[in-house]
Amino acid sequence: MAGGGTEAFPDLGEHCQDPDCKLLDFLPFTCDGCKLVFCLEHRSYKSHNCPKSDHGSRTVSICETCSIAIETTGFDEKGIKSLLEKHERSGDCDPNKKKKPTCPVKRCKEILTFANNLTCKYCGVKFCLKHRFPTDHVCNKKIINTAGTSSRWNERFMEALSLRNQKGCGRGSSVSSKSSPSVRSF
């Protein structure tokens, strides 16, 4: 018996070429990298430690101008750059084909333009008008330290309140007399 099979069917199946296996497999797999024959268990590149596992892999680069994928298999970094420059000089590179930015909220497909997007003041991400409020999108960051502004607001409120009541509210601050009262009676 030369390659595999049984005495009755000598051409049926082949032995796995993994050194630790040698299983007679009736439906063998031929590796497209190293061209050896393997059983079901050893058919993947990783399972038989294929030395040419990246043989069939493909790489692409995305053009920043038009968002077209350009195959760059087998090129080094310098070659990829020249390939992209060649594409940009050709008539195929059209900036109108570039994918427009969309709202980052899940399942929202609204295209963000200059007129319909707002940046969240808490997380700094651009959203469409429908999802502009922190409650409408999953806002990742909490309110940035606004203790200084809230204390100033409280001071202004207390000053206005003291003007209204004509009392110092225990603060002992002098109130300017040229400010007009907040409520007028006629």
UniProtKB/Swiss-Prot annotation:
PROSITE patterns: ZF_AN1. Zn(2+) 2 binds at residues 31, 34, 48, 50. SMART domains: ZnF_AN1. Zn(2+) 1 binds at residues 16, 21, 39, 42. Keywords: Metal-binding, Repeat, Zinc, Zinc-finger. A zinc finger (AN1-type) spans 10-58, 97-147. Residues 167-186 are annotated as: Disordered. Gene3D superfamilies: AN1-like Zinc finger (4.10.1110.10). Zn(2+) 3 binds at residues 103, 108, 128, 131. GO terms for biological process: response to abscisic acid. This is Zinc finger AN1 domain-containing stress-associated protein 12. It comes from Arabidopsis thaliana (Mouse-ear cress). The lineage of its organism: Eukaryota, Viridiplantae, Streptophyta, Embryophyta, Tracheophyta. The gene is SAP12.
